[in-house]
A protein has these predicted regions:
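Extended, composition-driven regions rather than compact fold-specific motifs
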Residues: 2-264
Length: 264
């Protein structure tokens, strides 16, 4: 293997495994951000040792049942065992920030109708409790790829916000399925990134990426030293992933495609 190939291998995203832990946490603070997100700070001694080094890491958030009871599982050699075999409602969320000295974890909840997490966040008050599982692992992505491309809707904005706080690339392109006013208020300073606002991902037809792909056809992609990140609705993410890997011949190791939700 040449030195160049070794260097490229070292720059590929690296997976890190974590010991699976479940934690009970309590709401410490809650504020409304950009009119569409609740930023909730959780605290608790159980957060000691929490790790989430990847910008789009996720924890499994478990919600209380209709009676208010919060269930935590037992981790055994045979796997995860839930009390009475009942698994509570759960959703994946990105850790936005973690203060290890104070054991305070911050996550942003996108507000939308009919969502168990959104409904809980809307009602949440200081002292309310949740259970968290994971992260099971992290994908650590170099911050200084020369070219970086990010496509997401509102659900991906917390991970993107975290990424933009540390990214060092000179050539960053953002294609965002969100209202420009909300996106600008939420993300704040995006430095020199070039952003294309595509309208809210909640709008009818927003999950069809045909028009976006036509736009992307005009974008020149480098052959090396790049990273592409795609998130949002499952079918749209798959079509975009197929486009970049198949039609645009990008290396699948440098294309991160993750479905954050699925249209029903």
């Amino acid at each position: 293997m040449s030195n160049s190939e070794k260097n490229n291998l070292r720059r590929l995203p690296q997976r890190i495994r974590h010991e699976l832990r479940f934690r009970q946490v309590a709401v410490a603070e809650k504020i409304l951000v950009a009119q569409r997100f609740y930023r909730i700070v959780f605290s608790g001694d159980a957060l000691a040792g929490f790790l989430a080094p990847g910008f789009d890491d996720h924890v499994k958030v478990f919600f209380p049942d209709a009676t208010g009871e919060l269930r935590l599982p037992t981790v055994t050699e045979q796997g995860i065992v839930w009390q009475d075999g009942v698994r509570p409602a759960a959703r994946d969320y990105t850790p936005l920030d973690f203060d290890a000295e104070r054991n305070r974890l911050t996550m942003d909840f996108y507000i939308h109708p009919g969502g168990v997490a959104s409904d809980w966040a809307s009602r949440a008050q200081p002292g309310d409790k949740l259970a968290l599982g994971g992260p099971r692992g992290s994908l650590v992505v170099a911050e200084d790829y020369a070219f970086q491309l990010y496509v997401c809707d509102e659900t991906g904005l917390p991970a993107l916000k975290r990424r933009l706080q540390t990214v060092q690339a000179a050539d960053i392109h953002l294609y965002l399925l969100t209202d420009a006013e909300i996106g600008q208020a939420y993300l704040g300073d995006i430095g020199g990134a070039q952003v294309t606002w595509l309208g809210s991902g909640d709008l009818p037809g927003a999950q069809d990426p045909t028009a976006l792909i036509t736009t992307l056809d005009t974008l020149t992609l480098p052959d090396e030293d790049y990273f592409i990140w795609l998130t949002g609705e499952g079918q749209r993410v798959k079509r975009l992933s197929d486009y970049f890997i198949g039609q645009r011949r990008r290396d699948d190791a440098s294309v991160r495609a993750v479905a954050y939700w699925h249209q029903k």
